[in-house]
Amino acid sequence: MASNSSSGHDVRPPSLTPSEIDKILSMTLIANLATLGEDDTIHIVPMWFMRFGNDIFIPTSRLTRKYKNLKARPYASVMIDISREGLDLKGALIRGPVELVEGEEARKINHQIHLKYVTEEGLNDPSIALYLSKGDDVTVRIHMGHIVNWNLADSKAGRALRIKDRSRQLDA
């Protein structure tokens, strides 16, 4: 991405502004959480999330692989992005140390995250309520130590690909 073209023009896409990063981190999107397993394999899963201050919070269960990985190696990467067809791509990759929050504090945080993704009516459905209350008993707190961002949507190529019929639609 950071290479120059043969004509000497810089082809690096523009970066997101701090307010654009804040906007993406406040949207109802899916975060991709990456942890490192004991055999040095990467475990990556799609997760609900919420940002509070300089931390990203993700609900999970102590029975999951990600919990076991983070208990042994408390460091993670999280990618939160908007990906559409062509080069209509914007996002942030956050890397940092992890704290595992448990007990009543985790229950309260997780409930707030659930409200971001599920309506009150949905939370009152017994099957959904049981799944979320029993399944999400831990909160992963990722301290935003390092943030990398991209904004290919506002690059010259990204704008050109938004012209009708220049890119193919992604499958839903």
What are these regions (language model features)?
Residues 2-16, 90-172:
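Charged, gly/pro-rich active-site loop segments
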Residues 11-14, 18-29:
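Aromatic-glycine hotspot motif
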Residues 25-26, 71-72, 133:
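Alpha-helix boundary recognition
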Residues 28-62, 70, 77-81:
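Short beta-strand segments
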Residues 39-41, 84-87, 130-134:
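A short beta-turn/loop motif at secondary-structure boundaries
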Residues 58-61, 68-69, 108-109, 130-132:
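Short histidine-centered beta-strand/loop micro-motifs
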Residues 59, 64-99:
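Helix-adjacent hinge/juxtasegments
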